[in-house]
Amino acid sequence: MLFSVIIPTYNRARYIRATLDSLQAQEFADYETIVVDDGSTDGTLSILSETPWVRVLRQENKGPGAARNLGASQCSGQYIAFLDSDDVWFPWTLKTFAEAIRVQNEPDLVAAKLFEFYHERELESVKEEPLKLDIFPDYYSTSRMGYFVGACMMVLRKSVFEESGGFTNAPIYAEDCDLALRLGLVRRFVQILSPVTLGYRQHQTNARRNYPRIYRGTLNLIDSERAGRYPGGEARKTQRIRLVTLHTRPFSVACVTHSYHRFGWTLYRKTFCWHVRTLRWKYLIGFPLVALWHGIRVQRNAQEAVQTQQL
């Protein structure tokens, strides 16, 4: 079997049916599907009971990393493809993964091409296109390209996943970024440029909206790099910090624009020297200005609210 598709889920009754329907529509047949329920309390399990072709595993709520690890420990495919239970694949997705693996002589790590959407009708604009790939000796070699490899984009050799130790079981987010960095030196990284293979759903309960947990996960990336937990030593340090700060920069800005000022400033301070080393002057100068502007705006809005109450 070429692929094991592993789907962690937690209270996704609203979306998981569309996810599974997109799997059933695949034009490539050599795969198994494992869904790991992470302690759902809504109707997710009821929906899963209607899909006998899916292998369902259950655990107490431990987070998506632990759920993916459980699925990976029970799978039999040569490659593992992760899919989140609120996202969808296109009919050609697994076929595209298989072709990329074939033409590149079985690379260790392949990354999907995603399309962000809010409403499923937006997916109608996505069409199958000829295969185009960007090839690198390893993931660290992409550090100047800005390629992000989230869990739902990962297709990797099962043996490589096992050797890495899998996702952290800590109850934090950015566990996928941590794994990608630990996989930084595996043999050959392939980024799919076309066709689009993943429909990444945007909604109010997206993990990316949980700022405290993302903050803890982002701090883990910084601390892990400082502690030498990522491979490559001093020779690959600049590449690693480019990849770490690829995550810290946008998140620090998002923090200060959503009133998590302490989070944003802490990330700015902790990565300041790294940004100097990689010559990120626009960020080093721009972040304080953005933080100041939003701080003034919040203060002004608060004053206006007080004045309105006094009228």
Report the location of each language-model feature.
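Conserved nucleotide-sugar donor-binding catalytic segment
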Residues: 112, 130-217
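Conserved donor NDP-sugar-binding/catalytic core segment of glycosyltransferases
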Residues: 92-125
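Short aromatic/hydrophobic "clamp" motif used to bind/position activated sugar donors
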Residues: 80
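Acidic helix N-cap motif at the loop->helix transition within catalytic regions
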Residues: 14-17, 40-50, 88, 92
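C-terminal subregions of glycosyltransferases and related glycan-biosynthesis enzymes
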Residues: 202-311
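A conserved acidic beta->alpha catalytic loop
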Residues: 22, 29, 37-46, 62, ...
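Glycine-rich, basic loop-to-helix element that forms the pyrophosphate-binding segment
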Residues: 59-75, 96, 140
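Short, well-formed alpha-helical segments that are part of the catalytic scaffolds
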Residues: 12-25
